[in-house]
Every structure is written in C-alpha cells, then in structure tokens.
Amino acid sequence: MAAPEAEVLSSAAVPDLEWYEKSEETHASQIELLETSSTQEPLNASEAFCPRDCMVPVVFPGPVSQEGCCQFTCELLKHIMYQRQQLPLPYEQLKHFYRKPSPQAEEMLKKKPRATTEVSSRKCQQALAELESVLSHLEDFFARTLVPRVLILLGGNALSPKEFYELDLSLLAPYSVDQSLSTAACLRRLFRAIFMADAFSELQAPPLMGTVVMAQGHRNCGEDWFRPKLNYRVPSRGHKLTVTLSCGRPSIRTTAWEDYIWFQAPVTFKGFRE
C-alpha cells in the first residue's frame, strides 16, 4: 500500500523531538481522561454527543505531512467500512480477491451458481469503484487545502445519519514530506490507539447503509467535486467515534478556521455483502 518507510526525523532535524517522545508515555492516561471528560463537561447543544461516545487522542512524536493527513483519512474510511460490515473483507483484500482471484478464490467462485457469482461480482465492482472514486477525490481535496476535520456518515442522511465518525486534524501543522515523520509509522500508531480503545466491539451489527464523506476546507480552495455546504451543522445524534490527532503541543500554525467550510462528497456509496 505504502512506499518503503522513510526514516523518522532525528532530534536534530525536529526541534523538541525529545519532548514529543515523552508525551507518548501519557497516551493511555489521555484516552481515559478524554473518555471521562466527554460525559462530564457540558457541550454545545448543536453538537452534543451521547454518553457512549468514544474519544481517541493520538499524539505523534513530530510533524506529519499533508499527504500523511490524507492517508490517515482514507485508511480510516476503509477501516470503518469493514468494521461496520459494509464490506465483507478489508478493502485491500477485497480489491485483490475480485480483481486478481487467487486459486482459492477461483475455486470458491466455481462452487457458487453462475447467476449468484455474477451478481456478487457486479456488486463488488460497483462498491469498489464508488469507494475508489471518493478516495481519489479526497487526495485531490487534500492537495488543494488544509483539512481540519472529516466526517464519515453512515445511514440516514448528512443531517441525521445513523452513525458518524469524526477525524480531527485541526491540531496538526502539516509539513512537507521530507520534514515529516514516516506516514507508515504514524498509521501504525493511529490504528494501535483505535484498537486499544475498542471502539467497535459494542456496536450492533448494522444493515447495509449509504456512506457520505464530509470534509472541511478553505472556502476559496477552488474545489469542484466536493459540494460546499455553507450552513452545515455537525449532527447531534449518531456519534460513535472521534479520533483527534496532534503533535503533542498546540499547532504553531495560526489558521483562520472561520474561513473554512464543510464540503460534501456528491455521491452516497454503498457497500455490499456476499
């Protein structure tokens, strides 16, 4: 999936890297603290979360690239689609299974009735094509603008989804690739934190649902695929997980987030089941 992993920056290349590394020691306690505070502190009524919300902070030991932020988003989307049973296999396995069947896969397909095999293959191809289109346009979007927040909405509609998941990137100050940590190493840290939080184990098995992606970007970024939603408000129900990424201390970048608006993917893509 990713190119061979580059070396993580030395402490000489990244100021205060030693300070960042110490922050990892408090990672587990931060998860517990945020989960506790989410049920105690009053929240804005328009974005109130239910008591079972899972808040997962992930602290990276240094800066990350804008390309890395995009990959975090894409991999989280794939992960949620599989964990919430919208895809029968993880995305990469599914793509390999249907586009270049292994001998075992070919043998399984032979055992199924021809009509069933054709329908299943057609549904899979459509689901993969729709998801790949969204992933591709997310890459273009991240190349145009900083993206402080992303929402992944399942079921219902964009205003009232059955479930929604948030990725908060607003505390990151993206750097160029050669100044940043290895994206592969950051992905391992991200998903380790999600697995430790056990965010999906208590959720009931859902039906197949439509999925919509919302992302914040600069109002003048020139985006022409994602549709601007000037008055969009984050849903008040259905929240399941927020992953907050940071580099261990407030971002040095001073960004006028009031100039950033929500954009909505113009497609609602649906997974499939065999």
Swiss-Prot record:
Main location as per UniProt: nucleus
Q: Which residues cross the membrane?
A: none
Provide the residue span(s) of the region labelled Interaction with MAD2L1: 45-78
Q: What are the record's GO terms for cellular component?
A: cytoplasm; nuclear membrane; nucleolus; nucleoplasm; nucleus; spindle
Which keywords, in A-to-Z order, does the entry hold? Cytoplasm, Cytoskeleton, Nucleus, Phosphoprotein
Q: Which Gene3D superfamilies match?
A: 3.30.900.20
Descriptive protein name: MAD2L1-binding protein
Organism of derivation: Homo sapiens
Task: Show the taxonomic lineage.
Answer: Eukaryota, Metazoa, Chordata, Craniata, Vertebrata
Q: Which gene encodes it?
A: MAD2L1BP
